[in-house]
Amino acid sequence: MAEGKKTDDYTIQMDSIDQGNKSFEAPPPPQPRSPPSGSLSNNPILPVLAYCGSSILMTVMNKYVLSGTDFNLNFFLLCIQSLVCIIAIQTCKSCGLITYRDFSADEARKWFPITLLLIGMIYTGSKALQFLSIPVYTIFKNLTIILIAYGEVLWFGGSVTGLTLFSFGLMVLSSIIAAWADIKHAVESNGDATAKVSTLNAGYIWMLVNCLCTSSYVLGMRKRIKLTNFKDFDTMFYNNLLSIPVLIVLSAFLEDWSSTNVNRNFPPMDRNSIVFAMILSGLSSVFISYTSAWCVRVTSSTTYSMVGALNKLPIAISGLIFFDAPVTFPSVSAIVVGFVSGIVYAVAKIKQNAKPRTGVLPTANPPVSASSQSMRDSLRS
């Protein structure tokens, strides 16, 4: 589309050539179109705030549902979220707000392995978030970036710059500090320290598996998307549509649907609020995709990268505000180091994009669609 625009701008109109002088003046270079000054939709502050708010909303709503007493219907939660997402984007398509291709059995067959990786990723992510606090979960999610980067090196011939490597070191350091702060607080706090440490260890194991699943999903999607040529909402449509039947089967056969367990997961006093949070968490994934595309359109991809890095801080702080996450010097230090690592990584990506494209990580080179990038950011958040 951009190439077509360039061609139109520099096309020579033969009837405008001065036949007497046998010469002509080249048309002036195209001027950037400034958005209408009075339009709220073109105010760069609004999409940035909307994107950050959507990311926080999704994480907080998921944590609220998963932090219930002995919640164990994770597959059902993910199924509801996928169903809500399909209804939402289909409604938006009917209203002309977004567009994506119609369902094709052949495309579904090609994409189904990616959907299975997605299910593994979101399930292990929900289990990790269930056992860990939001700040620790957010910090450890940064480790996925390292796995993806070196996966690109192994399978796509990429390379890692020195600044990127430095950001990786900060990510690992922040994760070590966060784990140490969590275990230290569990040992020193009142109650059964052994049980608390055991819960944290389970969370760390789920987090490790989630990082592996997430990197496999992102790398697999990068390779598979060449076969389907999916755009932003095509990916969202097929991911959620294909995951629904799988999640229904997994929930029906692997989860306890006895009346006792259902009442434990959905206490009568909190049932409506839990269901509302489940629906809202499903809508938030659509909000993230839409607001990230809005953010890139109104600002720039560079600004969007920095917003994604800065967004880690409010997400981590939301865990301190809305939930009983320990506020100690080590835990705050881990958040700060993780925040700085995100900024350094974003700066490294920006510098890579500014350099010639030889010898640079493929993840930084191709122009990534806004909602595809936002999907990666939401998985890290």
UniProtKB/Swiss-Prot annotation:
Biased composition (Pro residues): 26-35
GO molecular function, one term: GDP-mannose transmembrane transporter activity
Stretches assigned to the Cytoplasmic side: 1-44, 92-109, 151-159, 221-234, 295-302, 348-381
Keywords, in A-Z order: Cytoplasmic vesicle, Endoplasmic reticulum, Golgi apparatus, Membrane, Sugar transport, Transmembrane, Transmembrane helix, Transport
Listed Polar residues bias regions: 366-381
Topology of this chain in the membrane: Multi-pass membrane protein
CC per GO annotation: cytoplasmic vesicle membrane; endoplasmic reticulum membrane; Golgi membrane
Any matching Pfam family: UAA
Disordered: region residues: 19-41, 358-381
Compartments, as annotated in UniProt: Golgi apparatus membrane; Cytoplasmic vesicle membrane; Endoplasmic reticulum membrane
Subunit-level organization: Homooligomer.
Descriptive protein name: GDP-mannose transporter
Organism: Aspergillus niger (strain ATCC MYA-4892 / CBS 513.88 / FGSC A1513)
Recorded name of the encoding gene: gmt1
